[in-house]
Amino acid sequence: MVFRGGSAQFYSCASCAGAPSDITGGIVNYPSLLSGGQILVSDGTKGTRGGIGFGGGKLFLVIARNSSYLDLANIFKSLGATDALNLDGGGSSALYDGTYKAGPGRPLPNAVIIK
């Protein structure tokens, strides 16, 4: 996932070398949950999951408890995301908007910050 101005775009690793030069930020992780509106995962193992998605000009950040990758992909799809990427889960999952809305379960060394 790369950020360009006020938008986000998803690239597969195979096409990262051809990504535009005006990228202002990026995130790489595994697995991809949605691509072009299609669900890419089938794992049913439950846990705390976090992800980031984009669709319809909107950026979505989701923390889901007791969810599988498939559950998380379906949540993003129901919100209108066409592309979504799993982020670190478990105790690393946190959502902050002035105060913590979810987590964290431990000190976190890095964060995705949306301004």
What are these regions (language model features)?
Residues 1-115:
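Gly/Ser/Thr/Pro-rich low-complexity, intrinsically disordered segments
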